[in-house]
Design a protein with these regions (language model features):
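Conserved donor-binding/catalytic core segment of Leloir-type glycosyltransferases
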Residues: 4, 192-221
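Conserved acidic donor-binding segment of nucleotide-sugar-dependent glycosyltransferases
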Residues: 255, 311-322, 329-335
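Nucleotide-sugar donor phosphate/pyrophosphate-binding loop at the beta->alpha transition
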Residues: 109, 120-143
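Aromatic "clamp/platform" in nucleotide-sugar-dependent glycosyltransferases that forms part
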Residues: 280
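Short hydrophobic beta-strand element within catalytic cores of glycosyltransferases
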Residues: 293, 297-300
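Short alpha-helical donor nucleotide-sugar binding micro-motif in glycosyltransferases
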Residues: 258, 267-272
Length: 370
């Protein structure tokens, strides 16, 4: 089967979606299928990669986001016709929803992957009141379900906004690359810092409003107020970087530039004693899973999908600096916290995730052939 994947919200410095696309593509190819991918790029380019052929299409930058959008339906349709896939897998329910109808006219299967929570985005990032925001999200989701043969979500949280409309959404958790994200030290002997040793904290998540990164800064402020010797390292970038640097003035917070080498990133994150993952709208939270795989216990918020991922590998807390600071202190006291974090991460593999995706594609193909 030739599976064409399409994603708009991917950039050289984006995170979870780009990682998922690469991992699924590699596993599809290893299973004997053919995988192709269309993503935005600065110019027209075709490269052969481990995940299959990657087509980069000129796109229009979205100011202040770091992303670009492929807008040309005519150009995209012509490219997709030239690629001639047996199935499509689209990671964007808004700007590329028309692709489901494109696939249906050609008699091939279509899967839409919902990497974001439309309801949460409408409520938190627009001036629309709660009830109209829910109605708007429901409309978008019903249209998506109508246009595609299957809807896939990475978590129960992401699937809920479909289920409440009677839409059958498959839940396919993501995975982690254990060859890269593996503990750098013996977890059985890893103890909390002794008195006089600085507690190292790492922030998980892009620096954008929907990730609520300010909560991590305020958690450090609360820990300092309690007299703890802590230092938090923030990896990554985003539109809130300047604001967060200003907020963190006079606090022990280090902002690290974007690290492209995944092994280096893993080594640096794996040196932390505790991680903080504050994103309330995460539909999975791949960065949190990767830090768990390194054996770093994690405090996450009790909203969104992070609690489904972190589970016994950390602490689930309300989104307040006090509650998160309590969570950090609890993990520093918890016996075997680092072993439990790694054990939790081992529930999530890319092999299982990709196999479930292939089962969905193959089920659609059997249905179309019947």
């Amino acid at each position: 089967m030739h599976i064409l994947r399409v994603a708009n919200f991917v950039s050289p410095r984006s995170g979870g979606i780009k990682t998922a696309l690469r991992a699924w593509g590699e596993h599809y190819q290893a299973a004997g299928h053919r995988a192709s991918l269309i993503i935005p790029g600065p110019g027209q380019e075709i490269t052969e990669e481990s995940q299959g052929l990657v087509y980069r299409v000129p796109a229009m930058p979205i100011p202040g986001t770091g992303y670009s959008l492929m807008w040309s339906r005519v150009g995209m349709s012509q490219l997709m016709d030239a690629i001639a896939p047996d199935a499509i897998e689209v990671s964007d329910r808004a700007t590329t929803r028309w692709m489901g109808r494109w696939a249906r006219r050609r008699g091939i299967g279509s899967v839409m992957i919902s990497h974001e929570n439309m309801t949460g985005i409408m409520v938190r990032r627009t001036p629309v009141p709660n009830r109209p925001a829910h109605w708007s999200a429901d409309l978008v989701n019903r249209l998506s379900a109508h246009d595609y043969d299957a809807i896939v979500c990475p978590s129960e949280f992401a699937a809920e906004e479909f289920h409440r409309n009677g839409i059958d959404a498959h839940v396919v958790p993501l995975g982690v690359d254990f060859s890269v994200f593996t503990p750098q030290r013996d977890l059985t002997t890893w103890a909390a810092p002794a008195p006089g040793e600085r507690i190292q904290i790492v922030h998980c998540g892009r620096l954008s409003p929907e990730k609520n990164p300010a909560l991590s800064i305020e958690t450090v402020r609360e820990l300092v107020r309690r007299g703890l010797d802590v230092e938090m390292t923030v990896f990554g970038e985003g539109p809130m970087l300047r604001e967060l640097v200003q907020r963190a003035q006079n606090l022990p917070v280090v902002f690290h530039s974007y690290i492209t080498d995944r092994a280096e990133l893993a080594a640096r994150m794996g040196a932390a004693d505790v991680a903080i993952a504050p994103g309330p709208l995460e539909t999975f939270g791949l960065a949190a899973l990767e830090v768990l795989a390194l054996g770093v216990p994690t405090v996450c918020c009790d909203e969104g999908a992070l609690q489904e991922v972190v589970g016994s590998g950390g602490v689930v807390a309300p989104s307040t600096p006090t509650a998160f600071a309590d969570g950090v202190e609890e993990l520093l006291r918890r016996p075997r916290a680092h072993e439990l974090a790694r054990a939790r991460a081992e529930h999530f593999t890319w092999a299982a995730s990709a196999q479930r995706m292939l089962e969905i594609h193959e089920g659609i193909r059997r249905w179309l052939d019947a």
